[in-house]
Amino acid sequence: TARSVTATPLHSAREAARAAPSLDALRALLENFDGCALKSTATRLVFADGNPQARIMFVGEAPGRDEDIEGLPFVGRSGKLLDRMIAAIGRDRSTAYIANVIPWRPPGNRTPTPQETQICLPFIQRQIELVNPDVLVTLGNPSTQTLLSTREGITTTRGKWFDYDTGTRTIRPMATLHPALLPPPPAYKPLPRQDP
């Protein structure tokens, strides 16, 4: 007797992601993908920002309120701090590519469930493969543990190089703190004028 096979959301995500020949196609697939409940509670898809030909790619966990409104990753306070991190290595957003493991904001900025993360994982994996960066920077514990398949925390993995196999090549990822965990930059205080 023939068994009826019902595609699970995870199976559908894997098949859809695998079929995307380009970043534009992947974005279109995500816009039409209904296998993750977060899509229905988010304002919009937050796909990526920056240069798709960049040699360095940054990946965080999920969009926040500001990102959900603007449709771009890392645009709020964390975005300003990420911009400073990128500037510290002599680059800016036009020379980097920025995305999240989860492309939709979880309600109330809650932590995505393991199921939501697993459903979205094939899409970010395909996005990494299509961007094909030389260096992948995971921002914070959730993206590090998800993409690098480790249970070690960010305090242990931070600053260490790993290997990430895309299926076609190995990329060098490094884990670092999420910008939200960094202290805010010191307030600018002008020096008192000193007359000679």
Role assignments for model-derived ranges:
Residues 1-196:
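A polyanion-binding, active-site-adjacent surface
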